[in-house]
Amino acid sequence: MAQPLVIGHACAAGEAPANTLAGVRACLDAGADAMEIDVQLSSDGIPVLMHDETLDRTTNLSGPVRSRSCAELQAADAGDGEPVPTLADVLALVDGRLTVMCELKATPGEADFDQRLVDAVLADIERRDARTWSAIHSFNPDMVARARATQPRVSATIISGPVQGDEVDRLLGALLKRNGQAVSIEYPCIDRALVVKAKRRQVTVWTWTPDSEEEWARLIEAGVDGIITNVPHKLSAYLARR
């Protein structure tokens, strides 16, 4: 059975502050195949790494991410003295050594702002000539569609929470309608039947975010293509022992 790809979550959130350059280095050190990052726009339109809509939980700042300039965010402490990095910072550090999966955070009711985020991220990818080692991920199918229409050479994934039965068919249909290549599904609902259904439609299956050997073993048996984990070093070591 083929081994799944090792994909760090929020860079490597269980090994370094989430969405920081320290996390990028942890993924690289672990020999990860890919790394998922969360991307939003600063007030001056620069793609930066941040999971939450607000800064309160993970930095020493407060308020919405989009209310702060890039300079303010880079002066913040995102954990252990790490600044909030820009997407450009991350792409420069990675330089093609792993795939950078950019999860684009949608803003409900603000389609124009979402489009600006898609366009800004793709522009950074273009500037770094990173089309072959970058990908777009989003819970928002419209953002996936815009990304694929704008830059077909960059692969795209629709993210989903738990799905079962007809919900799986609807998810796969939504992906293919938007010319995407993969789904990223919350791990508890993943089973062999779901993966087989996706494979029949030539859809890649990622899963998030299991951190235990028991779950990794189950997901490998199910046939997933990649595991998004907070602990890429541990997953890499586990796969090396199999």
Locations of the language-model features?
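Phosphate-group recognition and catalysis centered on beta-loop-alpha active-site segments
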Residues: M1-R242
